[in-house]
Swiss-Prot record:
Residues 1-54 form the ClpX-type ZB domain. This is ATP-dependent Clp protease ATP-binding subunit ClpX. CDD domains: RecA-like_ClpX. Component of the ClpX-ClpP complex. Forms a hexameric ring that, in the presence of ATP, binds to fourteen ClpP subunits assembled into a disk-like structure with a central cavity, resembling the structure of eukaryotic proteasomes. GO terms for cellular component: HslUV protease complex. Zn(2+) binds at C13, C16, C35, C38. ATP-dependent specificity component of the Clp protease. It directs the protease to specific substrates. Can perform chaperone functions in the absence of ClpP. The gene is clpX.
Length: 409
């Protein structure tokens, strides 16, 4: 029996036996109580088990040739870029496994983030997405132009990490081994003597903010997004094992490369050509060119792997329409098959779709919108026409001079 009223009102944790005076907080449940210390202990046990599961998932990372084989199923062309990405991604996750098992005096492997340079619609984002999907790791995309340095209206760089956490269902251990793709990095190039007026005035500040999370830091992430404030509880995310893939079109960088190569040819003679006739200027880009474009050297140093993507040709775009596992032609054929209708594209129709994408300078990303324009009336009318069994898309249907051909049973 309790000897006094205070003892009668005392609450004890059902797990460790401590009373309310010995801990910060006790939570009441159905016929049981738990203290904050036991909650924290349980969370730590769960975190350790989840971390072990994540490590087990990454212990058998596909070899570079296997990754390339996976990419080839979905991505047409860009052979050099695919090889560079396959090697970089394999080495990154091998480094994580090595780091988690290494002895104290072993060599420390540094992280190798990736810089992808290529025109709009050449497949930069899709390559990063495909890699993340093939590895089954969380993936997030961020637009560098939406980011601002501290004190300005806009997104903090920590919000990039929030997107990754959301992709990982707020499993911190999984998020800390995910992939982040930062697009439009060229649009925040710092001002220089040869800079376009469209570049972000505060670009260098944003680059500095990105540098911190890319090189590896423990960042405080607001779980609800937005700006930080003192009352908001933060999630701590260690970025040292997050792979950052940074991409941009870098319009005009070819001129910087040409100028550099021209100076070398003048200075050392025609026999010392720095570029092969069959190699494009994009493949000849070096760190010096990127720095001259307006990316700070510290950030370039944290992006040691360069992957240059070429402008896609008409033939490339036709192959993209036809060949990948998720090719657009196959997708639209599947859509119409649900209405028991077969869909066919003439060869010159696919050529015309590719030509339109080239004219619009949208690359592969513009192909879907062109097909949508061509097939809008078909997809509206055909489901209501029970006797239609075949739709044939001709060149004239694509260029708008005629309608798609409908064949009935």
């Amino acid at each position: 029996m309790p000897t006094n009223r205070n003892e009668e009102m005392m609450v004890y944790c059902s797990f460790c036996g401590k009373n309310q005076d010995e801990v910060q907080k006790i939570i009441a449940g159905n016929n049981a109580f738990i203290c904050n210390e036991c909650v924290e202990l349980a969370q730590e046990i769960i975190r350790e088990e989840l971390a072990e599961e994540v490590l087990a998932d990454l212990s058998e990372v596909p070899k570079p040739q296997e990754l390339l084989h996976i990419l080839n199923h979905y991505v047409i062309g860009q052979e050099r870029a695919k090889r560079a990405l396959a090697v970089a991604v394999y080495n990154h996750y091998k480094r994580i496994n090595f780091h988690d098992s290494r002895e104290e005096d072993d060599v420390e492997l540094q992280k190798s983030n990736i810089l992808m340079i290529g025109p709009t619609g050449s497949g930069k984002t899709f390559l990063a997405q495909t890699l993340a999907r093939s590895l089954n790791v969380p993936f997030a995309i961020a637009d560098a132009t939406a980011l601002t340095e501290a004190g300005y209206v806009g997104e903090d760089v920590e919000n990039i990490l929030l997107k990754l956490l959301q992709a990982a269902d707020f499993n911190i251990e999984r998020a800390e081994r995910g992939i982040i793709y930062v697009d439009e990095i060229d649009k925040i190039a710092k001002k220089s003597e040869n800079v376009s007026i469209t570049r972000d005035v505060s670009g260098e500040g944003v680059q500095q903010a990105l540098l911190k999370i890319i090189e590896g830091t423990v960042a405080s992430v607001p779980p609800q997004g937005g700006r930080k404030h003192p009352q908001q509880e933060m999630i701590q995310v260690d970025t040292k094992n997050i792979l950052f893939i940074v991409g941009g079109a870098f319009d005009g960088i070819e001129e910087i490369v040409k100028q550099r190569l021209g100076e070398k040819i003048i200075g050392f003679g025609q026999n010392n050509k720095a570029i092969d006739e069959n190699e494009s200027y994009m493949q000849a880009i070096i760190a010096e060119d990127i720095q001259k474009f307006g990316i700070i050297p510290e950030l370039i140093g944290r992006l040691p792997v360069f992957a240059a993507l070429e402008q896609l040709t008409v033939d490339d775009l036709v192959r993209i329409l036809r060949e990948p596992k998720n090719a657009l032609v196959k997708q639209y054929q599947a859509l119409l098959s649900y209405d028991d209708v077969k869909l066919e594209f003439d060869d010159d129709a696919l050529q015309e779709i590719a030509n339109k994408a080239i004219e619009r300078k949208t690359g592969a990303r513009g192909l879907r919108s062109i097909i949508e324009e061509t097939m809008m009336d078909v997809m509206f009318e055909v489901p209501s026409k029970e006797n239609v069994k075949l739709v044939r898309i001709t060149k004239e249907a694509v260029d708008g001079t005629d309608k798609p051909i409908l064949e009935t049973a």
